[in-house]
Structure formats: structure tokens, C-alpha cells
Amino acid sequence: MQHVNHSSFDKASKAGFIIALGIVYGDIGTSPLYTMQSLVENQGGISSVTESFILGSISLIIWTLTLITTIKYVLVALKADNHHEGGIFSLYTLVRKMTPWLIVPAVIGGATLLSDGALTPAVTVTSAVEGLKVVPSLQHIFQNQSNVIFATLFILLLLFAIQRFGTGVIGKLFGPIMFIWFAFLGISGFLNSFAHPEVFKAINPYYGLKLLFSPENHKGIFILGSIFLATTGAEALYSDLGHVGRGNIHVSWPFVKVAIILSYCGQGAWILANKNAGNELNPFFASIPSQFTMHVVILATLAAIIASQALISGSFTLVSEAMRLKIFPQFRSTYPGDNIGQTYIPVINWFLFAITTSIVLLFKTSAHMEAAYGLAITITMLMTTILLSFFLIQKGVKRGLVLLMMIFFGILEGIFFLASAVKFMHGGYVVVIIAVAIIFIMTIWYKGSKIVSRYVKLLDLKDYIGQLDKLRHDHRYPIYHTNVVYLTNRMEGDMIDKSIMYSILDKRPKKAQVYWFVNIKVTDEPYTAEYKVDMMGTDFIVKVELYLGFKMRQTVSRYLRTIVEELLESGRLPKQGKTYSVRPDSKVGDFRFIVLDERFSSSQNLKPGERFVMLMKSSIKHWTATPIRWFGLQFSEVTTEVVPLIFTANRGLPIKEKIELTTTGD
């Protein structure tokens, strides 16, 4: 997945327009497959709907797309870019210094967005495959829902299985396919609208408001739970800002919006003209002439796969950002593409696959899945509204205007949340359970890191310069390695983790020519790659602070190679010639990376709550990437040392010597 060139971020191009269609609009663009079907089924079927119901439903869809997608996301949220990156975690990095509690909406929003990513592929692919029921030559096969489920699971298995290889080649087809899809939505919807041209009156919000309070509406205000399905992809639109640029979204959204609205109008007109067609039909596929149905099902399936791919890739990006912000466990990641935007996280991939397939097997039909869909994303949108309000205040927007915006969208999205909450007992509990589980994991990881940073002891490195220099020249000890490198996330100025000095001095003393202490600091900018060096007035101690953006790979060995070369060229680091080497001109000696594997001991004297957090974090850590993989050290010389997380002085346990009393004979 490519990232837009920063110089053209606000510009639009023909190529960018097509790319945006393939990346940004998959979710929102496939909503016509199931939204109208959900509305009609909740009303009692096609035979139960009236003209006022159809006009009101389409009106509510149009104004939901306008208020939430167009105004909130396209016009407001897209301005909240973190160095041209969007999404809830990018937004959080912009405002997190304003108040500590903003971590709460960030974690909740990220978790619910991730849980939504597990449901979207299930709904979209199942809806598309169910279209085969109206293909005359295949009806005898796919009228049996078990065959629909089998085909859906097969497509999902292929989709998740190819993630490890990246989408570089086939990804180039996504844009053109989605252009054809949206063109089809618009044209077919427009042509179907001639069956009942009155549907275009739905642009008047009066019909939507009238339906909400009309006795004809069997669901009352809870109809908004189905209406919301039309705009679930709005959050993904913001998340993909960095991939296509603001300019291309601004230009492509009107085209997409018109195509989607025409599709809803066409379906509505067909329903009013065919009220005796049968209650089990999906209006989207039923409104297509039979000779084109097979072609449309294939196109819809491709669009559903592209939408699912966008959600899966978005989930990888979301988790990757959370890991670098230290609010998510560091799972093993690979980069199958040629550019930094393509990330593959095996644990997340197969977690999503397991959840998605379980949802298909549990709910069986797209209609039942729709009953669970939308609840999680309403929570994400509410959390985005909170963070967005703080961003606008930070940018100097008048607090009164920000308050009005927050109240307006808070009430609007709150109503959608309440309308969707009724879905909880009809399947919504599944995504809520997933979201709560993710929130639990993120909270444990975040709190655990805070506990460690609060208790772990730091030492002043200046106090040990003499010992390190003496060790370098102590002939009683053999040379351990020319360069010894310690990676640490706890280095503040000259203060360094006690475990590191314990490893060098108190265990088998590690004699080296140069001691390196490398600390990685993740910046709020996504693509920073800078470093700072402090040699503390010596030529044998090198403190390195690596400043890497939250989207950058933390491949330390490759960055260190560049730093060493620059230090040698500047003369700050003495040359380290090798006697034996395939490179006679080599100026650098051998390197040994020391990775400290910190283990929590249950014997530590912590409060019960803190003990529980640390025990849970230790359990989760078994599933995470090793530091060797995380820091890209697979092909380097590495020693892993297991050290305890020492929160208090390690005192001996009380014990007394047993003395045997001996008696002597008279």
C-alpha cells in the first residue's frame, strides 16, 4: 500500500482518483449490497413497505452520508492529519500532550475499529455470494444456504492466506475494479429510478424526519440501526488519509457519494414497482435484469473482496501504530511489499480469520450478520469526535464552536449508538466481546509498562565510566567482543537501566573496546529517521538515541551501520581494523548485541492490582515477537540474557542455621 507524496498531499490527480477508489471506499461502497435489504426485512418484507417508508429511508441515508461522512470526516477530520497521516491513533498523537486521559478514547476507539474489521469481511462477502441465489442456472445450488456458507468460507480462506505475500501486484487492479463498481452503481441505480421517479424527492430531509415518527415505521427510532450501515466506512476513509492524500479524497468522494445515492434510489424505485416480488429477495440483486445477474455477482464479489482487503490492511496498520505507541503487545511483523506501507502481522491475520469465519458459521446469513453490524463503529465515531474536539481547540478554534460541534455530533452519533444498541442481543454482543477483549489487552500492556517505569531503578552512567575503562584494559579477562551493544527503552540523559550495568559488570564481565547503549524514541511524526549521539567525553562509550516515526520499522542493526560509518568518518570513533575479514578495507570490528529478556517474578512485593497486571502482561508476552525479531537482529550476533524485573531490593529470605548439639560420654 503506497503512501502519498507529501508535496502532492492536497493535490488531486487522475491516478490518485483511481487509487483512492480502490483503497478508501471499499467498505462504504459495498454497503448498498445489504443496507436496503436490512431496512426492508426489519419492516416485514417488500410487501409491507410504502412509498413514504422508501422515501423516508432513502432520505435518512442521504442525510446520514452528508452529516457524518461529508461534513464530519471529509470536511473536518481530514484536516486533522499528523504529518499527512490519518486515523484515530494519528489523531491521538496530535492531542495526547493536552491531557493524559485522552488515552481512554484512543484505546476504546482503536479496539472497536479493530473488532469492526473482523465483521466487515463476513458481511460483505456473504452478501455478495448470496447474489448467486438469483442466477437462474445456479439457483438450485445456492438456494441451499450451506453452499453459500461454504463458498464464503473458501473465499475468506484464500483472502487471509495471501496476506503474507502482500498485495503489490493485484493491488494495482483494485482502483479500476472499484471504478467499474461505482459506475455500475450509479448507472444501474439511475436507470432503475425511472420505474418510480418520485424517489428523488428523498433529498428533502422532511421525509426522513417524518418517517422517524410515523406509525408506518415498525421499528421507530431503531430504524437508524439499519440506516447507519450506509456510513460504516466513514472511519476507514479517515484512516486511509496517508495512503491517497487529502486532495484525492476531496475529489473522489462526490463521485462515490452520488453513485451510492443513485443505487439506493434505484433499489427503492424497484421495490415500489415490484411489491409482489417476494419478501426473501435482496433488492440490490433483484433489481438487476436476469441476463446481467451473473456478471453483477462476480463484480460484487470482487468489490467485497477489495473492501475486505482494505479492512484487513487497515487492521495491520492500526495494530502496527498501536505497537509503536506502546499501547499494544509487540507482535511479530513482516513487510511483504516493496514500500513501508505494507505490513503483515501473522497473529492479527489469523485472529481476524478465526473471528470472521466464526461469525459466518454462527450467523449463517448476511441478514443475521447485519443485525450485529454497526454497533462497534458507532463507538469508534464517538471516540473520534472527542479527540477531534481537542484537536480543534489545540488549533485555536473558538471553544464555543468546538462545543457546538461536539454536542451536535455527540448527540447524532449517540442516537445512532442507542439505535444500534438494540442489536446487542441479536448478535451485537459478539463484536462487543471482541472489543472488550482487545481493550483488556491494550490496558494491561499500557498499565504494565507504567508500573515498570515507575519502579525500575536507573543508575548514573557517569559513575561507571572509570570501571568500564578499567575493564577494557584488564588483561585478566579475555575480549568479549569489539563492540557490545545494549538496546534499552529506559535511558534518560545519563541515567541508564540498572540491569544493563549488572549485565556488564556483575555477571561475567564483558570486556569490549566500545560499549554502545541504544535507546529508541518513537516520535509523533510517522516517518522520522534521526539520531543523536553522546560519547560522554570518551572514545569507548556511545549513547545513541534513535528517533523513529511511529510507522517506521525499528531495524536497529541497519540504522547502527549508518551511524558507525558517520562516526568513523568524523573521527569521533577510533578505527577498529580486522585481522581476518573478506573485506580488507573494513574499519569496523565485530558487534555483539545483548538483549535483556526481562521476566516478572511473582515473589515481587507489589500491590495486588499491580501484581495482577504484571502477571497478565507476562502471559501475553509469550505470544509477542522476540526483541531479536522486533529490532531486526535475526542476522546479527545476539546474546539473550534473562534478567528479573527487580522492583524492590532483592533481600534474602529469613532462615537460620540448624546446629546439631552433640553429647560426649562420661
UniProtKB/Swiss-Prot annotation:
Keywords: Cell membrane, Ion transport, Membrane, Potassium, Potassium transport, Symport, Transmembrane, Transmembrane helix, Transport. One of its GO terms (cellular component) is plasma membrane. It holds the Pfam family K_trans_C. It is a multi-pass membrane protein. InterPro entries: K+_transporter, K_trans_C, K_trans_N, Kup. One of its GO terms (molecular function) is potassium ion transmembrane transporter activity. The chain crosses the membrane at residues 16-36, 58-78, 99-119, 141-161, 167-187, 221-241, 253-273, 292-312, 343-363, 373-393, 402-422, 424-444. It comes from the Bacteria. It is found in: Cell membrane. It catalyses: K(+)(in) + H(+)(in) = K(+)(out) + H(+)(out). Transport of potassium into the cell. Likely operates as a K(+):H(+) symporter. Belongs to the HAK/KUP transporter (TC 2.A.72) family. This is Probable potassium transport system protein Kup.
